[in-house]
């Protein structure tokens, strides 16, 4: 099968690397990335979109290859000067090159441009070869409910503070996507789902990346109705995360940290879930009812391995949905609904 239009739901590092492999595997296909913006934050008066920037820098050749985020050849003069002034926060590193992106973004947002247009303008410099769409133009921020170490009372902190400052050490009790109820899909997102030959869930965090994207009203329904097959790639390999903090997030929703656990959490599209097919790592076993499961090498250890993973994902997308999606307006029993 020749794929004309492929849509990918992506978070940061894992999603960016998967997209790079996909671009290599199918250079002639139209690729659209719907990127999580729940990690976005305003610091020092600047609007920062970590996942969008990681995808843009990775595909544009400007990423720091060692860290997997931020700019290559970065310097930290402004960060040092801010620290010398005692300007908080000091725990979030903004490099000098990276600051230029945030300055341009913030200036355009302040001038009234929506995030989708701002992202397109920024991407025009980087030429990523992939259409980059934020999940929404509205402001949505993930907050984490934790216990105050001093009082034991519950408090909510921004996801970036929980992850970057505290390294996800305070046990998360809940994740709250502030603003998501009032959000709408960004222009082009629902249309991309409607025209897709395949929709791929990158090996991104199921809770705070993929789950946040599909929390935007209308996007889960758009995914259910897409004419192409929906294939997910497990972010869990041999019972552990490859990168990130999914192992700290999944238990909050009562999801087992395993390829099977995440697959069941996503569920079968034929039963109101997300998946037609699910890729797990070679040697991992997963029983996901009504979902075709394939075991292939998942580690994106080189450009060649990543492109091979992308091709395996597309192989699983051939043949149309495993079972027809439910009729419009139907839904399965609430007790069986995956809780993103």
Stretches found by the model and what they are:
Residues 27-29, 226-230, 275:
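A short helix->loop->beta-strand "cap" motif at the edges of active sites that frequently abuts
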Residues 173-193:
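Active-site glycine-rich loop that binds ribose-phosphate moieties when present
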């Amino acid at each position: 099968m020749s794929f004309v239009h492929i849509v990918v739901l992506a978070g940061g590092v894992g999603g960016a690397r998967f997209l790079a492999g996909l671009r290599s595997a199918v250079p002639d296909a139209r690729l659209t990335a719907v990127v999580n913006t729940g990690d976005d934050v305003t610091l020092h008066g600047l609007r920062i979109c970590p996942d969008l920037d990681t995808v843009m820098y990775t595909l544009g050749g400007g990423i720091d290859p060692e860290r997997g985020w931020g700019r290559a050849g970065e310097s930290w003069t402004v960060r040092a000067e801010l620290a010398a002034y005692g300007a908080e926060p000091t725990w979030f590193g903004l490099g000098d090159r990276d600051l230029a992106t945030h300055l341009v973004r913030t200036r355009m947002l302040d001038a009234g441009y929506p995030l989708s247009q701002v992202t397109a303008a920024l991407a025009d410099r980087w030429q990523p070869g992939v259409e980059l769409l934020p999940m929404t133009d509205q402001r949505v921020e993930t907050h984490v409910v934790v216990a105050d170490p001093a009082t034991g009372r519950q408090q909510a902190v921004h996801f970036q503070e929980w992850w970057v400052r505290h390294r996800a050490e305070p046990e998360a009790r809940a994740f709250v996507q502030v603003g998501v109820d009032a959000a709408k899909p960004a222009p082009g997102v629902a249309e991309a789902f409607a025209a897709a030959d395949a929709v791929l869930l990158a090996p991104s965090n199921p809770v705070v990346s993929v789950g946040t994207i599909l929390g935007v009203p209308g996007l889960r329904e758009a995914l259910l109705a897409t004419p192409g097959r929906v294939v997910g790639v497990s972010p869990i390999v041999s019972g552990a995360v490859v990168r990130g903090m999914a192992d700290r997030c999944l238990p909050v929703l009562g999801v087992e940290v395993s390829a099977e656990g995440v697959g069941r959490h996503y569920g079968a599209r034929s039963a109101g879930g997300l998946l037609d097919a699910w890729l797990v790592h070679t040697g991992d076993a997963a029983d996901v009812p009504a979902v075709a499961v394939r075991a292939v090498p998942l580690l994106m250890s080189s450009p060649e391995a990543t492109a091979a993973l992308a091709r395996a994902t597309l192989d699983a997308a051939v043949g149309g949905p495993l079972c027809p999606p439910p009729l419009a307006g139907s839904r399965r029993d609430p007790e069986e609904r995956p809780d993103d």
